[in-house]
């Protein structure tokens, strides 16, 4: 338990931030899994591209706001792009 008032405040703030960070990362995880599921089930090309756009948009936002390291966001975007290109090439 914190002994000082400032330490109590830091604890409260870090707990709030932790919840917020987890929620944002969970949203991203859901988007990525959704795109993978669409590709695995051979969904319509337009639906997959829409899922790709929303995932890339979320990655950009998280990278800029530093919820993810910008390099990790960039790497994930490259992986998604490669996945999408392979899917489009197969169809």
Curated annotation (Swiss-Prot):
Keywords noted in UniProt: Ribonucleoprotein, Ribosomal protein, RNA-binding, rRNA-binding
Bias type Basic and acidic residues, positions: 1-18
GO cellular component annotations of the record: cytosol; small ribosomal subunit
Region (Disordered): 1-24
Coiled coil: none
Record-level Gene Ontology MF annotations: small ribosomal subunit rRNA binding; structural constituent of ribosome
Role, per record: Binds directly to 16S ribosomal RNA.
UniProt-recorded name of the protein: Small ribosomal subunit protein bS20
Gene that produces this protein: rpsT
């Amino acid at each position: 338990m914190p002994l000082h008032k400032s330490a109590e405040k830091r604890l409260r703030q870090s707990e709030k931030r932790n919840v917020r960070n987890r929620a944002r990362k969970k949203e991203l995880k859901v988007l990525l899994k959704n795109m993978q599921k669409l590709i695995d089930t051979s969904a319509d090309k337009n639906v997959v591209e829409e899922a790709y756009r929303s995932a890339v948009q979320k990655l950009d936002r998280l990278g800029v706001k530093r919820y993810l390291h910008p390099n990790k966001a960039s790497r994930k975007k490259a992986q998604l792009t490669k996945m999408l290109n392979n899917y489009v090439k197969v169809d």
